């Protein structure tokens, strides 16, 4: 089994090329592979396949709305093995992998996901690095909510970016205060509002066209970055300013991305790095099932 390792602003992934969607990705096996001590280690797994192959293999019962059978399909799994609808950083790395591996020669194409089609543009790309924009779809405001993070209670805006987020802007929070906050420990939220869990972003108020953010991802814990989370953060920060559209730079521990929000869409631009290629031991993989 061949694999690659990559990251988008230090949100890291194992990529498994499986064009016929033949591999058995049980939650147990994925969790073992993503474990940083007994596996390769990653925030998540990206199976590289097509929507038609995933459909034929029973990954889903019907094609996600707007996704064609011949579209590339990013089958994304969280580090705990659970299935996730979308991953903005993952799409950038996925698109970069296709281009670097010679599987895709266009600079603009569509990556399918459970959240629907995600058009991508590769502005620059080589075998190791890339600059990629992902059309993330409309970010939907879903009311307000609260979460307790690091022993502090935060109020935030619920945002659907193909997956659920609670983005909490704190006017009093400084960069130093954000850096010292315990985001790694389990967070508390309203499970009736978010029955399937939620990604929680804590961010500073926007200053000079930028915000700083940390994130606790459902099924993973704190990560160095979260693509859909940066979009949710930008929506919440703009809302905090009384705006519904605009462009913001979002600084995360793993780097910086640029998010543009319009009335009908959102766009995420940032880097991708492919750092390793290798082969999994078949015996080890079989033992994880």
Curated annotation (Swiss-Prot):
One of its GO terms (molecular function) is diaminopimelate epimerase activity. Pathway: Amino-acid biosynthesis; L-lysine biosynthesis via DAP pathway; DL-2,6-diaminopimelate from LL-2,6-diaminopimelate: step 1/1. Gene3D superfamilies: Diaminopimelate Epimerase, Chain A, domain 1. Substrate binds at residues 11, 78, 88-89, 163, 199, 217-218, 227-228. It is found in: Cytoplasm. GO terms for biological process: lysine biosynthetic process via diaminopimelate. Its EC number is 5.1.1.7. Pfam families: DAP_epimerase. PANTHER family: DIAMINOPIMELATE EPIMERASE (PTHR31689:SF0), DIAMINOPIMELATE EPIMERASE, CHLOROPLASTIC (PTHR31689). Belongs to the diaminopimelate epimerase family. Catalyzes the stereoinversion of LL-2,6-diaminopimelate (L,L-DAP) to meso-diaminopimelate (meso-DAP), a precursor of L-lysine and an essential component of the bacterial peptidoglycan. Homodimer. This is Diaminopimelate epimerase. It comes from Mycolicibacterium gilvum (strain PYR-GCK) (Mycobacterium gilvum (strain PYR-GCK)). The gene is dapF.
């Amino acid at each position: 089994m061949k694999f690659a390792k990559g990251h988008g602003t230090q949100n890291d992934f194992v990529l498994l090329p499986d064009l016929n969607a033949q591999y058995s990705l049980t939650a147990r096996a994925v969790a073992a592979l993503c474990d940083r001590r007994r596996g390769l280690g990653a925030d998540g797994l990206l199976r590289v396949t097509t929507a038609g192959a995933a459909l034929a293999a029973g990954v889903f019962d019907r094609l996600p709305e707007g996704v064609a059978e011949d579209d590339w399909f990013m089958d994304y799994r969280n580090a705990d093995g659970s299935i996730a609808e979308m991953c903005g950083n993952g799409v950038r790395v996925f698109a970069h992998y296709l281009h670097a591996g010679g599987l895709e020669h266009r600079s603009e194409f569509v990556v399918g996901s459970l959240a629907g089609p995600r058009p991508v543009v590769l502005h620059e790309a080589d075998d190791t690095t890339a600059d990629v924009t992902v059309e993330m779809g409309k970010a939907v405001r879903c009311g307000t909510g609260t979460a307790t993070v690091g022993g502090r209670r935060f109020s935030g805006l619920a945002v659907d970016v193909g997956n659920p987020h609670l983005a909490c802007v704190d006017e009093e929070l400084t960069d130093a205060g954000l850096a010292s906050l315990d985001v790694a420990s389990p967070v508390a939220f309203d499970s009736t509002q978010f029955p399937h869990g939620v990604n929680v972003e804590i961010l500073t108020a926007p200053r000079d066209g930028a915000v700083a953010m940390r994130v606790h991802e459902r099924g993973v814990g704190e990560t160095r970055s979260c693509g859909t989370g940066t979009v949710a953060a930008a929506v919440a920060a703009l809302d905090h300013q009384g705006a519904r559209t605009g462009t913001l730079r979002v600084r995360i521990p793993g780097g910086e991305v640029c998010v543009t929000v319009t009335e009908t869409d959102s766009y995420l631009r940032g880097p991708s790095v492919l750092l390793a290629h290798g082969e999994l031991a078949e015996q080890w993989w079989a033992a994880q099932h």
